[in-house]
Amino acid sequence: MSKNLTIVARIEANADKVELVKAELLKLVAPTMKETGCVQYDLHQDNENSAVFLFYENWESRELWQQHMNSSHLAAFIKATEGSLASFILNEMTKLSYA
């Protein structure tokens, strides 16, 4: 089995900040995809609650994901969305089965 790390990040914007949060999340995609170790970095928006976003990420290792967590573009996102998030839940996952 692969040693890749899967990250599922659930971000919920405050009701009045959905468009701001969405724009800032979209800014993360291009620079993150260029990072060493990033295999997949997909952003989703809930069909019924537009304030809910989900990143589905795959990284070559936890160490390389940690480098991402310390990146300047992630720091810029945190600063730009300060006070705009209702919740931010991060899960580190291990893939158990393959289709």
Language-model segments: residues:
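Short, glycine- and small/hydrophobic-rich beta-strand elements in well-ordered beta-sheets
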Residues: 30-52
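Glycine-rich beta-strand-turn "strand-cap" elements at beta-sheet edges
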Residues: 2-5, 43-48, 78-99
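An amphipathic, aromatic/His-enriched active-site/gating alpha helix that lines ligand/cofactor pockets
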Residues: 27, 33-39, 58-91
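Short, glycine/serine-rich, charged loops/turns that create anion-binding
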Residues: 12, 48, 60
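Short, surface-exposed ligand-recognition loops at beta-strand->loop->(often short) alpha-helix junctions
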Residues: 13-18
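Active-site-flanking beta-strand signature of metal-NTP-handling nucleotidyl enzymes
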Residues: 6-11
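Short amphipathic alpha-helical coupling segments at ligand-binding clamshell hinges
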Residues: 20-24
